[in-house]
Amino acid sequence: MLLGSVPQLDRIAVQLGPFPVYWYGVIIGTGVLLGLWLATREGERLGIHKDTFIDLVLIAVPIAILFARMYYVIFEWEYYSQNPSQIINIRQGGLAIHGGLIGAVITGILFAKRRGLSFWKLADIAAPSILLGQAIGRWGNFMNQEAHGDEVTRQFLEGLHLPDFIINQMYIDGVYYHPTFLYESLWNFAGVILLLALRKVNLRRGELFFTYLIWYSVGRFFVEGLRTDSLMLGPLRIAQVMSIGIVVISIIFIIVRRKMGQADKRYLEN
């Protein structure tokens, strides 16, 4: 196949005069809206008015984006210290999920305290929504042709029985790459199904959220090992270090909260 003969998708969804609207932002926004819809439905079933989650999203999403960008810039400071004007440019990506998660959790804790609500109850309800947003959001990386893995052959990708539009989009600068965005997206969608099923098990309050953290972190650890654009700290892949830490801390929290009697309430209790 001749170089440049592979049809690819445009990163720009629509052009509004001089302003391009990128698929990356459209896809992220879609993930947020679908996650909000899922959370408000479950929240109302458990006695929390939908406006609570709408208010939370309006506050948490901008803060999560800010933290996600800050996290990314910190670990890529060698580049951004020389190109400070690019720090606020997120049209081409550059949002780190772990940073966004830190921002969202801090916001959720403060929001719950101010509203007199249980953070763990809000977190449990939001867990499937967050993972759904992450599953959808990875397709923004797909459109940007980022967050991919090592070089592979077209035959390898065809052997995965992927549709042509995915295979073609993985053709970057004359080389085909592992669609790691897809692996993580599928893992996250499977996690959403698991979390929705676990709602019926009526776990102790907070443990659905910890299950989300563990599930996502396990998948991210293995997918990260395939990526070529990992944020690094010396020889370590930051996302893998964070994933291990999150799994360990989540398990410790589950055990300690049970032993201290802080997890007596169940998911379905008001």
Curated annotation (Swiss-Prot):
GO CC terms in record: plasma membrane
Transmembrane segments: 19-39, 54-74, 92-112, 116-136, 178-198, 206-226, 236-256
Sites where the protein binds a 1,2-diacyl-sn-glycero-3-phospho-(1'-sn-glycerol): R138
Record Pfam families: LGT (PF01790)
Compartments, as annotated in UniProt: Cell membrane
Origin: domain of life: Bacteria
InterPro entries: Lgt
Any one GO molecular-function label of the UniProt entry: phosphatidylglycerol-prolipoprotein diacylglyceryl transferase activity
Any Gene Ontology biological process: lipoprotein biosynthetic process
Coiled coil stretches, renumbered: none
Pathway recorded for this protein: Protein modification; lipoprotein biosynthesis (diacylglyceryl transfer)
Membrane topology: Multi-pass membrane protein
UniProt entry keywords in alphabetical sequence: Cell membrane, Membrane, Transferase, Transmembrane, Transmembrane helix
EC number of the protein: 2.5.1.145
NCBIfam families to which the protein is assigned, alphabetical: lgt
Protein family according to the UniProt entry: Belongs to the Lgt family.
Function: Catalyzes the transfer of the diacylglyceryl group from phosphatidylglycerol to the sulfhydryl group of the N-terminal cysteine of a prolipoprotein, the first step in the formation of mature lipoproteins.
Protein name: Phosphatidylglycerol--prolipoprotein diacylglyceryl transferase
Organism lineage: Bacteria, Bacillati, Bacillota, Bacilli, Bacillales
Gene name of this polypeptide: lgt
